[in-house]
Structure formats: structure tokens, C-alpha cells
Amino acid sequence: MFYWLIELTNTFPSLAMFRGLLNVFRYITFRTGGAVVTGALFVFLFGPWIIDHLRLRQGKGQPIRADGPQSHIISKKGTPTMGGLMILSGLVVSTVLWANPLNPYVWIVLAVTLGFGFVGFYDDYLKVTKQSHSGFAGRARILIEAGIALVACYALVRLGRDPSSTGLAIPFFKDLVIKFGWMYVIFGAFVIVGAGNAVNLTDGLDGLAIVPVMIASASFGLIAYLAGNAVFSDYLQIHYVAGTGELAVLCGAVLGAGLGFLWFNAPPASIFMGDTGSLALGGMLGSIAVAVKHEIVLAVIGGLFVLEAVSVIVQVASFKLTGKRIFKMAPIHHHFEQLGWTEPQIVIRFWIISVMLALVGLSTLKLR
């Protein structure tokens, strides 16, 4: 919306004297900074009201797994969930205010984010109303997520109108691209659905998921800015995707809204993100990675999410095949709880790992 202020100087000659001042709204970097501040302020201001409303509506709050760490039954009982509504509200308001409203990439990513958020909201709703840890049926949930992701990937490929838009670039190699053709739509959907559920599995401790999400968002905001700039992408020899630079504004909105949410989610949490937030944010990261053609880099920057997801897959597969569990409990953050690590130790150490993985992922931009 603010992006259009510069157009007012062209429509109304009397405002021409303000053109120099309003010209800053042309710059993605300025609007990204504005999105960060707006997202954070929105959640800071409206967060307490949302938390009180959810606590009143939910009563007992999110049901705690009986087979999970016993400490959670006492420390986390009664805490409301669906805190993702705070993040999504701040994200949407900030993005609408600061992003170019004519950019299709912004709307596609927002659609995926809100679509996954709705699926997560319904899952949270069932858990709270039934007071059961089992919510939305797994297969039905995955099918809906896959449908949203397939439509989004098809739209992204159509936007690209370039043979490379259906290819997979390999980091560290300048010209190595695996060409999928239209099968890329299926691959891209797998990336989006996988990212959504990986973040969902990570969200098991206070503050554990939101900071790695913010780190990944900041990283992909930079990648989107570079990939959407013809000069920078040519210098770095990465795939140029015209228009994706605007996704940096959306990433800034996520960073700001995430900072606001962390204020209330810091241990001991006043509210949980819930599937409403974790599925939405994971789907957002996946769709941005597909849009800017850095799918493999997402697996590096979001390596913590990959680790959490793989730990669950390995645990389930091992138990079904051998009757034995590899980890004391999955996802892997619960394994460390069982080993005696305190919740703050796990959370902060996982944050450190996320920072290191982000630096490794960003280094792939230059190492070609």
C-alpha cells in the first residue's frame, strides 16, 4: 500500500514537491525494514488481547501428550495454543502495507501461508475442543496441504516462463541444473509440504521453532533480494527470478511478527504457536525457496527442521522394522530432554545450530 505513495506524485502534480521524500518507498530495503517494525509493533500491541481471548475460549488450553516428557504435564498445562494467529495477523498486515500489491509472488506465498495456516488452525481447534492430542486426520491433512502446494507450484512455474523454472540448481556448482520438466511441480510441492511439517515437528519447546524460523526468514529475505536483482544475481552467478526481490518484504514481516511473538513465547510461554503457526511458517519458507530456486539451500539453512523430521521418520521406521527405538523419544529435542538437558539448554543450543546452518547456507551464494 505504501508502495503506491510514489505514484501519487505522478497522478497529482501538486504533490511533486514530495517526490524526493516519497521516493524511498521504491526501495525494497526500506520497505523491508518498515515491514519488520510494523510486524513487531502489531504483535506487541494486539498480542495480549489475542492471548486473553484464546485463554478464555480454550479453557484448559492445549492438551499435553501423556507419552511425552512428564515435566510438560505440569509446566505447560493450561497454556493456550493457536498463537500462530498473532504471527499471521502481523505478517499479513505488515505485508499488505509495505509490499508491492501488484507482485504475484507475494500473493502466491501469502496464499500458501494462509492455506497451511487454516489447516493448522483446524487441527488445533479439534485438539482443543476434544482435549485430545490427535486432531485432523493425518492423511486428509497431507492431501489438503499437497493440493495447496501443487497449485502454488504450478502458478510459480507459469510465472517463470523459462526452462530453468522447472530445474533444480545444485549449490557450489555454477552451471549444474537438474531438469525436471513439469515433474518439478510435484517436486516443489514436496518441498513445501515437507517444510511445513518439519517446522511443525520442531515446535515442541518454548521458543524452539520461532527463532530458527526467523533466522531462515532473514536468510531467505536476503536470497530473494539478490535473486530478484539482475546485477547481483549475475555477479553471484545464481538464478535470476524477476520480481522475487519483493519477497524480502514478506520475510521482513515474518521476522518482525516473530520477534513480537517471541516476547510472549519465551520460557515460560504465555502462548503456544500451535499448528496454526508452525504449518503456515514452514509452508511459507518452502514456497519462497521454490520461488527463488534455492530448494536445496533451504535444507541447509533449515537443517534443524530437517533433523527434527528425520528423527521422527527414523524412529518410526526402526520401531516398525525391528521393534526397537533409536532415540529415547522423538522428535529429537525430546531425546535430549530425556538425557537430562534442561529446556533452555536445548532451545538455545538449537538456536546456535540454526545460526551456523544459516551461515553455511548463505555461503553457497558465493562459492560457485
UniProtKB/Swiss-Prot annotation:
GO terms for cellular component: plasma membrane. It is a multi-pass membrane protein. Pfam families: Glycos_transf_4, MraY_sig1. Its EC number is 2.7.8.13. It is an enzyme of class 2 (transferase). Pathway: Cell wall biogenesis; peptidoglycan biosynthesis. The chain crosses the membrane at residues 34-54, 79-99, 102-122, 140-160, 176-196, 207-227, 247-267, 271-291, 296-316, 345-365. It is found in: Cell inner membrane. PROSITE patterns: MRAY_1 (PS01347), MRAY_2 (PS01348). It catalyses: UDP-N-acetyl-alpha-D-muramoyl-L-alanyl-gamma-D-glutamyl-meso-2,6-diaminopimeloyl-D-alanyl-D-alanine + di-trans,octa-cis-undecaprenyl phosphate = di-trans,octa-cis-undecaprenyl diphospho-N-acetyl-alpha-D-muramoyl-L-alanyl-D-glutamyl-meso-2,6-diaminopimeloyl-D-alanyl-D-alanine + UMP. Keywords: Cell cycle, Cell division, Cell inner membrane, Cell membrane, Cell shape, Cell wall biogenesis/degradation, Magnesium, Membrane, Metal-binding, Peptidoglycan synthesis, Transferase, Transmembrane, Transmembrane helix. Its cofactor is Mg(2+). Belongs to the glycosyltransferase 4 family. MraY subfamily. This is Phospho-N-acetylmuramoyl-pentapeptide-transferase. The gene is mraY.
